[in-house]
Each structure stands twice: as structure tokens, then as C-alpha cells.
């Protein structure tokens, strides 16, 4: 007999008229999804109660894949087809990731963003990220019981335009409507500020698996104003792993290049466990058997680890000092330092932050969850679910200056870094030669003075300029950055009115045709995805049915005679065996058989409960 499920008081889903939106922290190591439910932001766990989804995708033959925990478990045995830390490759070209430390992948030499060859074909970081985002989307829709109107996705504050566009492309591929790209430190400040009614100057120190950000924020009466942001989009907890990895190999006299890819991934996984153990113990041990039978046994002290990673710790303080200078404040002006990212659990980080700012950091919110919670608050607001206490304002900034190439390969900055967004700025330029009728406009991003040292974002031409003497034409170039930190550029010749514009699709972004092809490919694999999803749902329901039956037998097994008990036990055993297979229909059939086979038992339990409730009571009391 099927039983209806009723939620606890106050925990029922929000009313149907509420527009469902979520916050997603797309992390290097782990990703999370959160939503505001009953006016409280909360992280949404999977069916096993796990909040964190490992940012790992394993590709199989014939279009299959495993995502999250299942993929992570196979990373050491199938490293070439199991993509980890893909966030480090977002918006990056092959030349920029070629030296990726100990990466076991085969990078493909293709124009634009780096590609990775797998057993299921060549994949871009956008496609891999889309798999993770889609998994979080399904989790949210299953938990909330309806489709999402959109999501706020967090990105490192120091992500450039190419990396932001790649993130937005991944969301589009995953079927998500992006309400806003939100800087991770800002999201953390929202969660922390609203949770603690904080005011004053705060620093958000965000060290994740692959990126580092430091933001200075001013919180006053519901206004979150980012004064400055700095960071390093190629520095994170992974780098601490690689330093420890190198030390372990050096102590053992092993050349990393001589290791099989499987051993590299196995060692990196074990080294990460070792690093985490050193966060709570003065020393920790490593015991690994490699594929060739060689055994590595080492004990490393926390002091040794601290000295090994000291250069990385100092690398985080360099952009910290820069951000403080940009905000024109000193460490003494900072009221509190909020730690974000799992890597900030390392004592060596907490000690360095405390020493630099002269105060212990704030750690009352989970550093793994705080970004997703802040994004959920912003998503709920952008979806139109404004409630009491929601009259707050967010003022974010761009992390890197935007400029245009001028003669001689120089950069003229149009919008300086740390400008509040959204923003539009314009500047006039002129022609270089007599009779010049066209102008090439090269859009760049960065702080250096030479174009060669900055990132190229886009190129376009303004044609139809009336022929004039050099310096007579007036071309007004306008840069416009939206709330996501994405750029559009417009050029207009003032005399003739001729115009040209470009919505910046970075050199390492994806063309619309590429997105369309990926969407088409995703449709082709949709059946595989749905089968995998149906199988997982059937297995979860089977396990629920088995546990419910066993609990009932423990409580009221005496209601069955020996023959009936034997029959129920056989049905449970059959379902347990079938649930380990991959036939969803067979699992559903076996689950139904157990449900049908225990109908009479359920009825007897109900009768017993009623009799117990009525025992000793008179008719007129009922």
C-alpha cells in the first residue's frame, strides 16, 4: 500500500506562484546549488544528502558519462577520460594550459578555446562545465518540484571577459537561463552581510580549488559596494596539491614524467587527502601502491608542508595588497575578513590572513557553501520574489581594465579596473592618414600598456568614414559593460553618422554555430541521459522500499506467519539483487512486486495501530 508523504510543519514547498530561481557555485573542485525556501537560503543536497557535487565528468564510449561522485571514484583508473578542475581551462587557449601541472589529458590543437580528447570525442571546457551545471539543474528541479526561471551563477571576481562568456555559454548549453553572473566574493558578502547585519569595510579572501580572489567591500544599510577586487585566476588549492605532489616524488626519487597517468591521478588524490589531514594534525602519512607495484610510504609534518607552500601563500598576499591600495584603505581599516573556499580551511592560510590583517578571520559560515547561499539570495530577488528586508543594493565592479589598441600597439584604457557595473564610457579617436576611410578597432583587456601583454577580446572595422585630412575625422568609441561583466563596443563617426558595433565574443569564446552544434549533440545524447536518470531514480525508490519494509518487519514482524515472512524476505532479496543491475524497468517491476506483496502486511499494521489507539476508550469518547 503506497503511503502519502507529508512535509514537516513550516517546511512545505513555497507557494506555486513563487518563481523558482537558484544560485549555483560552479567550482573548480566542487559545485553546489542553493535556493531560498521559506525565506531562508539553503543548499540543496542530492538524494544521498550530499551538498557538494565534485566538479568531475567521466566520458564513456557511445555517449555515456558519469558526473560527480561516480566520476571522481573512477578518476584514478581512467584519468584521460575523467576531466577534473575544468574551471581552470575555461576561456583559455591551448598555449595557456599546455603546461598544466601533471594534467593527464590529450589537449587538441584547435582554434579558440582548448579542447580535450576523450573516448567519446573531443570536448571543450564549456561542454564539460555544462554537464556539471545540468546535473545541478536537475537536482534543483527535482527538489523544488518545478522548472526554474533562471539561475545566478558565480564566477571568480578576477575572471576576464573570455572566462565569463565561456561560463555563460556552458549555462546556455545546460538549459539554464542566466539571471546574472555574480562575483564569488560579492556573493559571499551578501550571505555574510545579510546573515549578520554587518556594516563597515570587509575583505573577502576567496581561495578555491583553482582561483584566488580578494575583494574589498563597503557594507552600509543594505548597500553592498565593491570598492576593489584583485586576484589570480590560476592559483588555488590544486596548486598546493601539486607542490606536495612534487615533494613526495622528490623524496622518493621518482620523475613525474615517468609516471603512468593512472598513477598521477591516484597520487594527486592521495596527496589531497594528506593535505586535508594536515589541517587538523601535526603530521600525516601517505601509503600508496603504484601500478608497477612500487610502494610509496612517507610521513610529512605540518611544518614541512607550511614551508613548501609558503611561496603560494605569499602569492595570495600580492593581489591582497593591490586591492587595498586600489580601495585606498589599510589592513587596520578592515572590520572583518570573510574566508571563502575550501582551501581556506588550511591553518597556514588562516594564520597568514590573521597576521596580515591583524585579526582572526571570520569563519562562522561554511566556506564551501557561503558563495552558493549568497547567489541564491540574489537569484530569488532577480526572479521577482521580493519580500520584507529585501531592499538592498548590489554595486559590483569589473576586475580588469578595458581598452582599445592605438597606433604603435599601445593600449588606451576606456574603462579602468574596479569601475562599478553596469557602466558605459566613451572616448573620441581620429584617423592617422589623409583620406583614411576605415578604422580597425581592437578591443583588449588588461592592465599592461602594450597590446601584446593584454588579452585580445574582439576586433571589428568601422567603414564608410568620409575621406578627410588626418586628424579631422571624429570617431566616438563607446564601451558598455552589463551587470554580468560582459562587454559591448560601439563606434560612430560623428560627421557622417556611420556606425559599427560588436557584442564581444572573445577569441576563446564559442561561436553561435558551435553552441548550436553542442545543443544538437546534447539532444542526441538526451536519451542516454534520460535512461541513466531513470535508472538512478528506480534504484533510489527500490532502496527506499527495501528500508521501509525492513523497518516494518522489525517493528511488527509477528503479524506475519512463517510462510508470509519467507515470501516477503524473498521479495526483498530479489529487489536488492535486481537493483544492483542497470535495467530500470526490471527494478520498477521488482519494486512494485514488493509493494504489492506487502499490501496485506500494511493493512494489518494499520489495524494494529487503530486498535492500540482505541484500546481502553469508551464509544462516547471517540
Swiss-Prot record:
SUPFAM superfamilies: Actin-like ATPase domain, Heat shock protein 70kD (HSP70), C-terminal subdomain, Heat shock protein 70kD (HSP70), peptide-binding domain. Gene3D superfamilies: 1.20.1270.10, 3.30.420.40, Actin, Chain A, domain 4 (3.90.640.10), Substrate Binding Domain Of DNAk, Chain A, domain 1 (2.60.34.10). Pfam families: HSP70. Coiled coil: none annotated. Keywords: ATP-binding, Chaperone, Nucleotide-binding. PANTHER family: HEAT SHOCK PROTEIN 70KDA. Belongs to the heat shock protein 70 family. Chaperone involved in the maturation of iron-sulfur cluster-containing proteins. Has a low intrinsic ATPase activity which is markedly stimulated by HscB. This is Chaperone protein HscA homolog. The gene is hscA.
